[in-house]
Structures are given as C-alpha cells and as structure tokens.
C-alpha cells in the first residue's frame, strides 16, 4: 500500500466518523 492509498483510506474512514459525531452532538442537545 502506498502512502496515498493509506491517506485516502484514513480520509474515507474519518468522514463518516465526523458526520456521526456531529449528528450525535445535535441529537444530544
């Protein structure tokens, strides 16, 4: 795996996590 592939994989894993976190904070309020 190249550095670019690792970066893309991390980005793809991070985006849904951030969205889920923001949704969770909105529902918590």
Swiss-Prot record:
One of its GO terms (cellular component) is plasma membrane-derived thylakoid membrane. InterPro entries: PSI_PsaM, PSI_PsaM_sf. It is found in: Cellular thylakoid membrane. Keywords: Membrane, Photosynthesis, Photosystem I, Thylakoid, Transmembrane, Transmembrane helix. Signal peptide: none annotated. The chain crosses the membrane at residues 7-24. It is a single-pass membrane protein. The keyword Transmembrane helix applies. GO terms for biological process: photosynthesis. Belongs to the PsaM family. This is Photosystem I reaction center subunit XII. It comes from Synechococcus sp. (strain ATCC 27144 / PCC 6301 / SAUG 1402/1) (Anacystis nidulans). The gene is psaM.
